Amino acid sequence: MADPSPEIKAVARYIRMSPYKVRRVLNQIRGRTYADALILLEFMPYAACEPVRKVLRSAVANAEHNNGLDPRDLVISKAYADQGPTLKRFRPRAQGRAYPIRKRTCHITIAVRPIEPEAATAS
């Protein structure tokens, strides 16, 4: 039997931003509806909001196009940022030394699902 509420996801890979900074934004939108999350992302003062907004719009577009779901009925079920490969650079310092610079990347994953009808009537 098919799952009545499928999860539709979108992934952005190799985003040139630290996963710690992206997780700070994802923790705020997890569990919220699509409309609430868009409003939050628009007014939060973090640079990580732009790539997260793009992935969220992509996940909702996937739900609309592939599953025929209404964006107003979608809630963010999963949102996480995994660490990607680190670009290693070196900063020259005095007396022949060099300090390492780690340019971190991350993979952002957002999954949306329709709001459960029994959960909406119970509250």
Curated annotation (Swiss-Prot):
InterPro entries to which the protein is assigned, alphabetical: Ribosomal_uL22, Ribosomal_uL22_bac/chlpt-type, Ribosomal_uL22_bac/org-type, Ribosomal_uL22_CS, Ribosomal_uL22_sf
Source superkingdom: Bacteria
One GO molecular-function entry: rRNA binding
Stored Gene3D superfamilies: Ribosomal protein L22/L17 (3.90.470.10)
Pfam families listed in its UniProt record: Ribosomal_L22
Plastid is among the record's keywords: no
Function: This protein binds specifically to 23S rRNA; its binding is stimulated by other ribosomal proteins, e.g. L4, L17, and L20. It is important during the early stages of 50S assembly. It makes multiple contacts with different domains of the 23S rRNA in the assembled 50S subunit and ribosome.
Family listed: Belongs to the universal ribosomal protein uL22 family.
Record's protein name: Large ribosomal subunit protein uL22
Name of the gene this protein is made from: rplV
